[in-house]
Amino acid sequence: MPSTASRIILSTLITISPLALAAQTVSTLDPAIRDRVDRIAAQVLQQTGVPSASVAIVQHGKLVYAHAYGSARLATDKTPAIPATPEMRYSIGSISKQFTATAILLLQEVGKLSLDDPIGKYLPGLTRGDEVTIRQILSHTSGYQDYWPEDYVMTTMLPPETAQQIIDTWGKKPLDFEPGTQWQYSNTNFVIAGAIVEKVTGAPYFDFLTHRIFRTLGMTSVWNSDQAKLTQVDATPYYRHAVGPLRVAPKEGLGWMFAAGELAMTAHDLALWDESLLAQSVLKPGSYKQMFTEVMLKNGQGTHYGLGVEVRDRDGHRSIEHGGEVSGFVSDNEVLIDDGVAVAVLTNQDAVGAASTIARLAAPIVAGYPPTPEEQQAIDIYHGLQQGRIDRTLLAPNLSDYFTPEAVADFQSSLAPLGEPLTFRQTRTALRGGMTFRSFDIIYPSKHLTLTTYTYPDGKLEQYLIAPAE
């Protein structure tokens, strides 16, 4: 299972009964925003070749949209393609880690354990278990080696395995680093955490989550994919070798995904979970603060990770997020915690970044973020070039010379037919040559452009170049 800090992920949603189907259909999002989200999802699927995506959106703290795109099952010589629906389930992979962290925090709230307890208090015999804390395993700062860093299912993972066998193998190896001194993504950490939940409660991990979280939130579609494959009414997982044809992905052996990536559900139900994160309805406020606070290393360096969640800054807005990938499925869940917005995306092909791309393009649109001054200037110049004009008062001499009548005409003839982009967002900034460098993504349904600019301290532009995105 790849590191969700570096993977980009997609997955779709599935249901099992007409009653559930009716309950999962949601569409109260503003039509203009809905159209932009639909266009983004369709474009990303077209560009990546991912068969399907299921998307659910929370706005103002409430689920307002659930929709699926593409084919949940591809056509074969004997059967037609099956369209994806919002009622279909997909494996959510490492997004499951949020639920494991929540289980630990629930137990801390009732005094059953503490985040700063050594894990050896509950699971004797692990490497330096008297030093490594529960907080460190939930934040990937323990030093325990990842049992699945590969981006494919090895033959050794096809037979069944138990959590205890994983712990006995990887939890008793020498640590990769001193506890608390580095951040390194490791699924082993969350297998250990799940085992602690079972030890403390005396109940199976999935049963505890069902009783304390899923039933409370009305998440009726949740499936334990670590113990049974998804059904025929759920999305089919796919993978490919190099750029070859899509093939049905092999399933990991039972037991391998315990507590680290075992859950499957609809995007609709993942969005119900996001509602609870925004409303802080499952845990006490102090527990959410611990979960959402970036864990710092012993040297004071940040990790961009809390407890089972990534902690990011998106253009000045706090984002609590995580991706997930298991064989044939990729997902992404982004929650703009102070804006009441969440975007959950599930896809049914592994090793592709469609889910993250959809989530990160859609989230600021749903939140209604206004363009920054730098973005607005870039957009205004872009619109002017589409009409065959350029405001030379904004340009330094070199750039003014660059925009010859021929150059302006080429910009107009190539950009005007594209119309209004879906998104126009700054993606990077840096200092170079006494100027500020900025790059922007310009996204269309069937085209992705990159704009690069250089700006002097006095605000004059030295560069404004557009090219196809690599």
Please report, for each region that a protein language model flagged, where it lies by residue.
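Short solvent-exposed beta->alpha transition segments
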Residues: 389-433
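Short, gly/Ser/Thr-rich active-site loops of penicillin-recognizing serine hydrolases
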Residues: 345-407, 469
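Short, conserved catalytic-motif segment at the N-terminal edge
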Residues: 28-90, 112-117, 172
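Short, well-ordered beta-strand elements
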Residues: 321-322, 332-349, 451-452, 461-467
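Short, surface-exposed loop or secondary-structure junction motifs
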Residues: 71-73, 130-327, 332, 337
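Exposed beta-sheet edge and beta->alpha loop/turn motif
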Residues: 429-470
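Active-site SXXK
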Residues: 35-41, 55, 61, 91-116, ...
